[in-house]
Amino acid sequence: ANGVGVDTPASTINILNWLAEAGVGLGSESRPEESQALMAQLLSGRSNDPESFHLRPLAYLPLNHYLRWWEKLTPVARALIEQRWGSPEQAVDLEEKGFAVHGLLLGHVAVLIQPSRGYDPDQISDLHSPDLPPPHRYLAQYLWLQEVHGTQLMVHVGKHGSAEWLPGKSVGLSEACGPGLALAPIPHVYPFIVNDPGEGSQAKRRGHAVILDHLTPPLGRAGLHGSLLSLEALLDEYVEARQVAAERCAVLEQQIKQLLQGLDWPSF
């Protein structure tokens, strides 16, 4: 749920609060006030997790709506997608009502989960693939934003999403390049960590994004906490007991085993 160096759910809540202060209607009943509530609402519906596919999505983009857009694409663009995913009618992610849109609708604001770039077990490879075209549902969700929801401003929260990594040219994108197919002519704002100008430039150059740099998070000394901190103390005491108080070892061993069982770890 987090972008690099930013708490994405908490940042999304902040953005929603700023929009509300600016007079944007967010609804009154279902608006989450904190990040845990936001994530709970998102995960109560359909997400990219296959185990959630029995849940209802936010909406559907009907196939006939998608086909009207599809027929306007260049033959080159259609061929690139069809070679990997087949025609829209053959799409593995097509349902009876159309292509599913995953997320929440809060008044005039849609908070969506970016679609998966592919359906391979190794999602990381799909995310960064220079050759994998976007599936039909990926394109359909962005089309829903543009033509059904009527989005006037799009915000991708945190480094980095997948739209700017879709196949195509590095600069001077053509009508067949993936980012242009997905993002459409919608103003695009992208909060991005300041210490990665290279990938920020990628989003700016290929995703027509206005980059809003944010600082890196403050650093702190890492350490153990909770049960792990107690385990460390018991292990230190056990090492000392083996040297000076062997009779104490049996008691410590039992305490360590109980703690490991509580952590659901195998004991010795």
PLM region descriptions:
Residues 1-268:
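Ligand/cofactor-recognition surfaces for anionic moieties
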